[in-house]
Amino acid sequence: GDRLHEYTVKEAIHDGAVLGFKVDYRNTLITDKSENDIPDTVYEDEEYMLEVLDAIIDKSRQQLGFQKGVGKTYNAILTVKSIPQAQAYYDLLKRVKAGETRVKVSERVKQVHPDFPKATITYSVTENEEDSRDNQDHMKQVLEDYNQEFDTHFTMADLRGFNTDVNNRLARKQDKYLYRKEQLDLVIVVNRLLTGFDAPCLSTLFIDRKPMQPQDLIQ
């Protein structure tokens, strides 16, 4: 039937019902081809992924609030197309932090947070997936890294607790997360945390995947 009423995002922002947002497009590829003509393998190439990480860790200081000083910066989410892609980004980011790639964490960033970015990854791990064993093995390493960073003790048997802890560190609603040692800067996801997640300190959603459904983006 005919539309009875329409309430747009623009009107909701004006009414203060939702927060405003700004979309920035960044091109990490130099090519004359249209996006549809670029093979998916290009987006899985390490050089491309390094450009994306450089855009996040060194060229987004203002969006992440580095001008506010130690312990007052915002955090962010990076969403990618698949679990293997998320795992690849996580592993590559560890190498960037270790100084093993051409992309380095800039001195301007280190002056504020020498340990930036403190990152983790979250995705569903099930027994029924064909590549479940690989996903579980990778998640075990993620948990080891996380436990070492934050002095926690999560295991594969307590992924629910791990995910809750990640959510809390992103939201920073508890006083203890006001201290830098307890803060998380970046979480890499596929579909998690994209809808219905309230995190006042989360300023930026980095999207490295094909266009998402509008309802997912707006939420």
Predicted feature residues:
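Signature of the SF2 helicase/ATPase Hel1-core->accessory helical subdomain module
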Residues: 1-40, 49, 194-219
